[in-house]
Amino acid sequence: MDMFSAPDRIPEQIRIFFKTMKQVVPAKAVCGSTVLDVAHKNGVDLEGACEGNLACSTCHVILEEPLYRKLGEPSDKEYDLIDQAFGATGTSRLGCQLRVDKSFENAVFTVPRATKNMAVDGFKPKPH
């Protein structure tokens, strides 16, 4: 890059919050990343057993009503997985399916107190 080229664009960051049973965790979120990735990068215990491949419900989060309405309907596959999630509500979504944008600024994502991981051996994968 020469001195007259445009500088590389810095990804826009916003702030979101994760509400767990013990605390509310502020998190820096890069627009375009998934809520699951943001949770992992900020030390929030949101499982993501399938590593974001829409094959489980362990990254289930509960959204506030205004944000849920703004996002539009989940896919049929996501709906099916939400039906299997522990403590699912009318505003539940999967963190791996939510791409952060500016409309998420200051949003609160509630992390349920448990997940249903269908693994029978007790294995809990580490965040990637």
From Swiss-Prot:
Record-given protein name: Adrenodoxin homolog
For this record, the Gene Ontology CC terms, alphabetical, are: mitochondrion; mitosome
Q: What's a single GO MF annotation on this record?
A: electron transfer activity
Q: Residues in domain 2Fe-2S ferredoxin-type?
A: 12-115
Binding positions for [2Fe-2S] cluster? 50, 56, 59, 96
- Report the domain of life of the source organism: Eukaryota
**Tell me, what does this protein do in biology?**
Ferredoxins are iron-sulfur proteins that transfer electrons in a wide variety of metabolic reactions.
What does this protein's record comment on cofactor binding? Binds 1 [2Fe-2S] cluster.
The entry's family comment says: Belongs to the adrenodoxin/putidaredoxin family.
